[in-house]
Amino acid sequence: MPRLSEVITALDALWPAERAESWDAVGTVVGEPDQEVSRVLFAVDPVQETVDEAVGLGADLLVTHHPLYLRGTTTVAASTFKGRVVHTLIKNDIALHVAHTNADTADPGVSDALAGALDLNVVRPLVPDPSDPEGRRGLGRVCELTHPLTVRELAARAAERLPATAQGIRVAGDPEATVRTVAVSGGSGDSLFDHVRAAGVDAFLTADLRHHPVSEARAHNPLALLDAAHWATEWPWCELGAAQLDEISDRHGWDLRVHVSKTVTDPWTAHVASAPTSSAMGAPN
Amino acid sequence: MPRLSEVITALDALWPAERAESWDAVGTVVGEPDQEVSRVLFAVDPVQETVDEAVGLGADLLVTHHPLYLRGTTTVAASTFKGRVVHTLIKNDIALHVAHTNADTADPGVSDALAGALDLNVVRPLVPDPSDPEGRRGLGRVCELTHPLTVRELAARAAERLPATAQGIRVAGDPEATVRTVAVSGGSGDSLFDHVRAAGVDAFLTADLRHHPVSEARAHNPLALLDAAHWATEWPWCELGAAQLDEISDRHGWDLRVHVSKTVTDPWTAHVASAPTSSAMGAPN
Amino acid sequence: MPRLSEVITALDALWPAERAESWDAVGTVVGEPDQEVSRVLFAVDPVQETVDEAVGLGADLLVTHHPLYLRGTTTVAASTFKGRVVHTLIKNDIALHVAHTNADTADPGVSDALAGALDLNVVRPLVPDPSDPEGRRGLGRVCELTHPLTVRELAARAAERLPATAQGIRVAGDPEATVRTVAVSGGSGDSLFDHVRAAGVDAFLTADLRHHPVSEARAHNPLALLDAAHWATEWPWCELGAAQLDEISDRHGWDLRVHVSKTVTDPWTAHVASAPTSSAMGAPN
Amino acid sequence: MPRLSEVITALDALWPAERAESWDAVGTVVGEPDQEVSRVLFAVDPVQETVDEAVGLGADLLVTHHPLYLRGTTTVAASTFKGRVVHTLIKNDIALHVAHTNADTADPGVSDALAGALDLNVVRPLVPDPSDPEGRRGLGRVCELTHPLTVRELAARAAERLPATAQGIRVAGDPEATVRTVAVSGGSGDSLFDHVRAAGVDAFLTADLRHHPVSEARAHNPLALLDAAHWATEWPWCELGAAQLDEISDRHGWDLRVHVSKTVTDPWTAHVASAPTSSAMGAPN
Amino acid sequence: MPRLSEVITALDALWPAERAESWDAVGTVVGEPDQEVSRVLFAVDPVQETVDEAVGLGADLLVTHHPLYLRGTTTVAASTFKGRVVHTLIKNDIALHVAHTNADTADPGVSDALAGALDLNVVRPLVPDPSDPEGRRGLGRVCELTHPLTVRELAARAAERLPATAQGIRVAGDPEATVRTVAVSGGSGDSLFDHVRAAGVDAFLTADLRHHPVSEARAHNPLALLDAAHWATEWPWCELGAAQLDEISDRHGWDLRVHVSKTVTDPWTAHVASAPTSSAMGAPN
Amino acid sequence: MPRLSEVITALDALWPAERAESWDAVGTVVGEPDQEVSRVLFAVDPVQETVDEAVGLGADLLVTHHPLYLRGTTTVAASTFKGRVVHTLIKNDIALHVAHTNADTADPGVSDALAGALDLNVVRPLVPDPSDPEGRRGLGRVCELTHPLTVRELAARAAERLPATAQGIRVAGDPEATVRTVAVSGGSGDSLFDHVRAAGVDAFLTADLRHHPVSEARAHNPLALLDAAHWATEWPWCELGAAQLDEISDRHGWDLRVHVSKTVTDPWTAHVASAPTSSAMGAPN
């Protein structure tokens, strides 16, 4: 059975810490280098729910995409919800390892998993990593559809193929417009509009899009926008990561049990559609 | 018929420029002080669609909540979409006046209109303006429901009473929890969580809520969150502002025709719900 | 007749926007890409006087050296004098295009025109642009006189050859010193003293020189300084620019009428010399 | 005969160091507290010329308005011109004391002396010092003329009453406009335009005015501007300061000999007017 | 037996978190609010040695003066020495609470304990806390000696009364000078020289003094400086804090066992005096 | 006899100013370029004591390692202790030249002299200067011992070989540990721990080490730390520098008398060891 330090070395080889953004907080957050690891759980969010799932599963290592302390903390007291996560992990001898922007840009990375879930053919990174001579690593992916779809059909495929969430998929632009090329980026994508426009794609699927960036993007050009739940766009990476670790485990004869969290940590729990004859002023345009 | 400078003086009395946030960009953006005004259009967004509506209506003055140039510009060339707005306004002798954070905190202001649209009884500002001795001005409103509702029922009321949008209302928290007190804030509200928690309300209705702030808010305490479309939470203020200007016009004998834009400038045009049996992993928790 | 976008493409080829300083604000400020252009006016300052001249002239495009909004604006309301300029331009279908620090460093640029007006032989840029392999572009010019002149004679030539202004030419240093080499830089030049000293010239002609920089420069070494009116040092570029556009127009068969503004927008309107026996304390040293 | 520390205490009472701007560098720059003082020289600039004058005069203390090291130095080596000033002072046992923005705002201060030289009746400070309950201290002065003058006549009075300089007086605005009220501020005044406009005066006399601030001020409103030589606007303060120290000396029985520098350290040494028929384009507007 | 939250409430009453400096990191760092507390250990440093001592002692709560994470951390992995401290604490159900600059300025606080250990009579805070109407709180203490001592005698008393360290006490200034008044400040004190000079004391005892601040302080005035080991100057506060908690425990009937760490965490382990006839150049001056 | 400018040229060749850190303040601080130099004194600190020594010696040039005004000054008034140094130097025609971080990194530099004094064999710079193709220049030195010593023995050698100071040598770590490799850096070295750890040496000798950096360094790994007096670690460079100037003088036939200051300007004047049975709590660990 491998020690934590050995498993971490393998994870670091998949997602090297030095490839994370300077503002990021990746790597091992909790855990003793010499503790033994037999069961691993992959999840998007390091929250009490996924930690409790890890405890229930008897996991020794929880690997998440989101950092626990992005902006640094001076306390892990259990009176804070993040401190309670640390206490639960240490008390149950569960290590926590984070792969965030280093996993976003990896090859394959978060947006490769997202593209795969949507049956999209990856062409190139949306924002290539200048340090990669082969131009495969980078943030987001520019993709082609095998067969053109309307925006509505692409949204329906996303709603069907991504983990179900209360939010579903929001669409901006003509639902009947044709889509042949699409850029995808897991997580918050409203800082990437310049790159998306430069890529000249028909549509852009990402998460956490807000009023002003979307309105201005639409005013710039008729690019269709699809907004899925942040968690749902990054959950596919958990399956990818688990599969990668499985393969490493087999190669090393570690006999690891690698699981993917079934807990939906997307915060939205319900959705109420606008009534078509809302008393205010009329149906959406 | 009043000159633009007289109408602006009246609008400034309702929403004094000095009460806007230091980062904001309120006041008259386009227009000649001496041009005559007979027809006014209120809208949320100063975009080509509402400007074209103003041209079609023969308006002389467009009053919007959102600024045209929040971060300052060195060009109004028509090759930029905002420049085209400026050219359309000037060529058609239409002035543009903005009331943004000075209207947010006004008494009555944007969140009063939002509370009114939802039949909520305003108790106090969520973030009182320290310069107001009477404590009525400020950002957001803390409200009470005449009769308790479940979170789902409150969401349904919002979906029904606010202008219809493709997004509808997203809910985080237990849909069946009871709501007696609710904080509301028009527009992007994810910087107000500390104030909302301090107010001790059961629910918070605002817009543009993203994954991390919502997840962390939910981890803090079981506060229910309702996310409506940014535009829909601020449209009710247009009706309020138009009514206020109507009343001023009568008082001055200006005989102004004051309209409220019917153009839905919320960018979301369609919504596709997650399939309950989405192939990924199962229904929302 | 060419469309504005075609003429702008030509102007951008002369003075590429990317060669402007990062703090600058060059390019098209007002105008519709498809509007037709037959008459163009060159001026230094985008002020009401030159805009009224453009209206009177029936110009379709005003090209100026100084930007209209160097520091960005959130309003173009006609209640502001710059807003009135924008309203006058748009109402009279006159576009505005700015070429500022990109014209300063161009080859030929503002200081070439200034050197030409003074019969000076350009040797090299005072501050070479590192991105120019041929070392011809850059700020200011180091020049040689065909025949040596005294400082007083050089000042007299400047007063005679540059457009007349109330200010005339101020001189610091020994008026009878001999000048063989001179650095010139149109506009405010008091940030260039280190470069001027390094060039080892006998004199430096520029504008907007103030007490402390001049006193310290004089204390450093006996470099003669000639201060002409800011506007007057940059007006020769208008003639150069107009000639360059004329030539382009001929080449394209555009048949453009290209004019140079006759309006003196130097703000100084009068000059009163010190009385030789001023009651205070005596004649200048 | 008083020691330096005693004379400095008296000067600090006139111009307390704590009333200088935070960016300023006032107080004693060179000198031994116990050295005896019998002869004092007042000057505007601490330059080699005024220091040599002090040596020739046998002065023990040089008091100047301008600081020697405004931005701090790490060397006083004589290879630098300011270092040579320090070496000359110390070798000749001459102390140096600076009263700059603390003298600007004093009551009486630099602008009182300037107003006095121009026969103007001081009404109030242009920028009152909030820490002065009596509202007499502050930057610049708002003045009234005993009898109205045209702008040209006021400029002629300034040229006649202020120490003669090669620059003379530059005027912006209608030379024939009538002046009843005028704001004056010794030294560089182009940061005070907002205050001057708020004061509603007919004219503003100061120094070091440059193209853009003057053009924009003139575009704002028809305020006449008079630009004298920086040194000339501050030299009257030397007479005021010398008189004040004389009076203190008498009171203490110090028998000080107090002189005012006759050295014109305004850097401009000659002026050449524009030829009325300058070959370029015509007389000034 | 009290829960941790109750003990923390008592400690917060002694050293309120809001009285810490804004850059500080005080309060509970590890621990579950509901865990029971019967045994408490006070120490200066939250390092592996004191944590091991707490484990050996069966403590439930470790209270330290120095924060564990002053600048915030994004990981508590046991591969880092601070992370190993967190893991040891949580695995052994030991809470960690920090009272740092809020204990420095408390009344009584760190410097009161230091003064007490040295038999000094506290007169007032060296840097009074403006928010304390009674003027008793603040950083450092100004003290009087009951009987004057020479600097050497005071140093000997400090060496004798403070916990023994390899460093002992360094002295700057005349060892035979007389001391009647002394300022003391536990921990690094080289930012307090201005306050110490203003207090006009004969000597200043603190820690972590470096060459340049000491040389410049000595050049300013003949103030004697005594430099003890950082840890030794703050260890007396552990005794004071333990006694205060004991008293609170008695009052609440908590029956707490409160201990003070015996582990010397001063890092210096040996000291070698300069040989009087060191081959370099001679005995100290 | 050489002029000051010639000697400075020679010193600049040894320690080029451009190789100093950007925050540093090296070069000639006082002196007239043409003054003659026959006698030179080297010292660490430009303080009154070494300046008085220079006056007593009849020196013409004082060369120090520490700058006089590191952060720039706006006054050299003799009422300040640094101003008194300037007055004494100028009155006695003594120049002052500083070689600080440019001497630290020179080859040979400050840490070479320190290593030499301790009989250590220099291997390479601790922090190589990237601009040195030969990799010999840089901050600090990594050294080897000819024969291994215990930490205590190395500390004893330092106490014996470096100029005697009241402080002596402080040691952190096991005094009996064996040392084969040691990094040395004259002056304050607590910013170099990362480099020292990366060099993998057994011990690090420097100065001005404080509690927190030393405690954390020790927690990182068992690296032994030796803290000598700041002045003592830099005094050996004076001998090195004097020898280098002697050699230059012979080469130029200048016949310079070059001295090394005997004044100990280390501020510590006495040391009192902790009593082994200090009443507080026991002997050091």
From Swiss-Prot, chains A, B, C, D, E, F:
Chain residues that bind a divalent metal cation 2: 66, 230, 234
Gene3D superfamilies for this protein: NIF3 (NGG1p interacting factor 3)-like
Pfam families the UniProt entry points to: DUF34_NIF3
GO molecular function: metal ion binding
Keywords annotated in UniProt: Metal-binding
GO CC terms of this entry: cytoplasm
Binding site for a divalent metal cation 1: 65, 104, 234
Membership in a protein family: Belongs to the GTP cyclohydrolase I type 2/NIF3 family.
Quaternary structure and interacting proteins, as annotated: Homohexamer.
Protein name (database record): GTP cyclohydrolase 1 type 2 homolog
Organism whose genome encodes this protein: Streptomyces coelicolor (strain ATCC BAA-471 / A3(2) / M145)
Upper lineage: Bacteria, Bacillati, Actinomycetota, Actinomycetes, Kitasatosporales
